[in-house]
């Protein structure tokens, strides 16, 4: 932002559109040691450092905060019921998705805050986010549960951020053909309600 603010075209720039990964904040799963450690720390906070409660919720007698492992790609590909995970069978997956999506939301909010601070709050900041309506995407033919890879499970956090001014999303990819129709993927009323 500082570089652009000092450029001859600075007065032509009204804002910044944050893009991560493909531009839509989708990524490949992070199986690094810091990701493993971050997940364990997040779980410790969520469950109040109570390993017995975690064992009960995950239905795992042998787990400790030190031996927690991230769900494999194959585990993330298969939901319990269509695109849904149930706490009774998949609390471990649910916890991981909440953690992973929270990290993504925190990241975009941190970037947005940095831009706002760097520009003296004079520039707009937006991003792709909020894809909660994906009609036709889960029809059994997808190679994985597509809902797990949309960094929008923490959409409320993004909506409530004072550093993000607008949110955008392409219309559904499923009906992009001759004779197709426009299907929005984001909850427009919620976005408007939050002043975005």
Q: Which residues does each predicted region cover?
A:
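Aromatic- and carboxylate-lined catalytic core of secreted/periplasmic carbohydrate-active enzymes
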Residues: 196
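Short amphipathic alpha-helices and their capping/turn segments at secondary-structure boundaries
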Residues: 3-8, 185-193
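Extended catalytic core of nucleotide-activated donor transferases of GT-like folds
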Residues: 175-187
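Polysaccharide-binding and catalytic clefts of secreted carbohydrate-active enzymes
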Residues: 1-164, 170-173, 181
């Amino acid at each position: 932002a500082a570089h652009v603010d000092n450029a001859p075209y600075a007065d032509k720039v009204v804002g910044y559109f944050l893009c991560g990964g493909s531009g839509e904040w989708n990524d490949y799963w992070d199986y690094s040691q810091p990701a493993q450690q971050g997940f364990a720390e997040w779980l410790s906070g969520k469950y109040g450092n109570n390993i017995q409660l975690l064992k009960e919720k995950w239905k795992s007698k042998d787990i400790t905060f030190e031996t927690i492992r991230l769900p494999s790609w194959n585990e993330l590909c298969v939901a319990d019921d269509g695109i849904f995970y149930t706490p009774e069978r998949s609390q471990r997956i649910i916890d991981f998705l909440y953690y992973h999506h929270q990290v993504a939301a925190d990241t975009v909010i941190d970037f947005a805050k940095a831009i706002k601070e760097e520009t003296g709050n004079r520039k707009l900041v937006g991003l792709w986010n909020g894809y909660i309506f994906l009609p036709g995407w889960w029809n059994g033919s997808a190679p994985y549960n597509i809902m797990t890879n949309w960094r929008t499970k923490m959409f409320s956090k993004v909506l409530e951020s004072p550093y993000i001014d607008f949110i955008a999303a392409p219309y559904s990819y499923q009906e992009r053909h001759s004779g197709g129709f426009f299907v929005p993927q984001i909850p427009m009323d919620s976005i408007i309600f939050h002043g975005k």
